[in-house]
């Protein structure tokens, strides 16, 4: 326990917390260009081929973004919008690619949670 004079000399420091999506800066989303689109396998105990893309952002950072939903049309040089949000079983994947924005098409035949996947309302 510090004395009063010690606290006057050096006040208490506030804890600094690490940003979770630091490459976005202060923006909620960022635009970028796909440099590589590929699949990767999750950590144990899960098993799948998860679709991810390496994206070069407009601020110069290169990040890995997850492509949600079934099927996608992304390839190299596709322009995408990225948001924060990690994928728990994919190490290093801390961003999500937004569906139905810029070059990314929405998910086909999506009936529920359509806004998350950029799907139009079915007739």
Swiss-Prot record:
PROSITE patterns: RIBOSOMAL_S12
Gene Ontology BP, a term: translation
Keywords for this protein: Methylation, Ribonucleoprotein, Ribosomal protein, RNA-binding, rRNA-binding, tRNA-binding
Disulfide bonds: none
GO molecular function: rRNA binding; structural constituent of ribosome; tRNA binding
Record PTM 3-methylthioaspartic acid, positions in chain: 89
Presence of the UniProt keyword Ribosomal protein in the record: yes
Record-linked InterPro entries: NA-bd_OB-fold (IPR012340), Ribosomal_uS12 (IPR006032), Ribosomal_uS12_bac (IPR005679)
CDD domains per UniProt: Ribosomal_S12
Keyword match Acetylation: no
GO cellular component, as recorded: small ribosomal subunit
UniProt-annotated stretches for the region Disordered: 11-32
Subunit structure comment from the entry: Part of the 30S ribosomal subunit. Contacts proteins S8 and S17. May interact with IF1 in the 30S initiation complex.
Family recorded in the similarity comment: Belongs to the universal ribosomal protein uS12 family.
NCBIfam families noted in UniProt: rpsL_bact (TIGR00981)
Function: With S4 and S5 plays an important role in translational accuracy.
HAMAP family recorded: Ribosomal_uS12_B
Protein name, as recorded: Small ribosomal subunit protein uS12
Source species: Methylocella silvestris (strain DSM 15510 / CIP 108128 / LMG 27833 / NCIMB 13906 / BL2)
């Amino acid at each position: 326990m510090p004395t009063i004079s010690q606290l006057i000399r050096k006040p208490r420091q506030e804890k600094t917390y690490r940003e979770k999506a630091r490459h976005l800066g202060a923006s909620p989303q960022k635009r970028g260009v796909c440099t590589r689109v590929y699949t990767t396998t999750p950590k144990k105990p899960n098993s799948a081929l998860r679709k991810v893309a390496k994206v070069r952002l407009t601020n110069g950072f290169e990040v890995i973004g997850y492509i949600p939903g079934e099927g996608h049309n992304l390839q190299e040089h596709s322009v995408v919008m990225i948001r924060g949000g990690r994928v728990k079983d994919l190490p290093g994947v801390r961003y999500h690619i937004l569906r139905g924005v810029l070059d990314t098409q929405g998910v086909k035949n999506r009936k529920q949670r359509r806004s998350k996947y950029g799907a139009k309302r079915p007739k």
